[in-house]
Amino acid sequence: MDEEVENKVILHGSFASPYSKRIELALRLKSIPYQFVQEDLQNKSQTLLRYNPVHKKIPVLVHNGKPISESLFIIEYIDETWSNGPHILPEDPYRRSKVRFWANYIQLHLYDLVIKVVKSEGEEQKKALTEVKEKLSVIEKEGLKEIFSDTDGEPTVTNETMSLVDIVMCTLLSPYKAHEEVLGLKIIDPEIVPGVYGWINAINETSVVKDLSPPYEQILEILRAFRQMSLSPVLETYQS
């Protein structure tokens, strides 16, 4: 505990976890130094279990010895605790509500579907992919104009303007090209959802995302390994 208090900001997570990447993005956007503790999700540490005794999942952020769990709550905590750097949640209450709404929409209605596409095959995979495209179309038609109301729905993302919803979308579909290569499927069609396509590519062009992203070949290896394990016996969930 003394070491963690001294280090002030410690993130317990996993290199391959999109949920951990959310927190790393938020910390880097705010230029907050932090220590990363790699957790073995098959053999969770007693420290992790002590810090998150309810869900027993990553990520957990420890600030001044006090743990915060659940990635979306952690990001809000970071934004409210450190006033330096860009605002991850808009100051305007109405815009903040819209960013929260669409971040929650992606979390609730898209995350599990994308994971199902990676983990399944045959008719189950086909059905999940159809649903993914339907949700992306909703974001294209209804979400972008609210997320990017300042630019008339035109996706523009920089290190200075990246918000909660950008972070959530980034950690889901930033590596969409690797998903498509591993699966042999088209997930994001620029002709059908040009706005979403432009949004994700704008996110990928930011320096904070480039600096945090592993090499493309490594992403392919991670996805292939995850898919292979997923087509074996059912995996337990360790992330939130």
UniProtKB/Swiss-Prot annotation:
GO MF, any single term: glutathione transferase activity
Record-annotated GST N-terminal domain positions: 7-86
Designated gene of the protein: GSTU9
Reactions mediated catalytically: RX + glutathione = an S-substituted glutathione + a halide anion + H(+)
Gene source species: Arabidopsis thaliana (Mouse-ear cress)
Protein name from the UniProt record: Glutathione S-transferase U9
Gene Ontology annotations of biological process type: glutathione metabolic process; toxin catabolic process
EC number: 2.5.1.18
Enzyme type, top EC level: transferase
Function, in words: May be involved in the conjugation of reduced glutathione to a wide number of exogenous and endogenous hydrophobic electrophiles and have a detoxification role against certain herbicides.
Modified sites of kind Phosphothreonine: 161
PROSITE patterns in UniProt: GST_CTER, GST_NTER
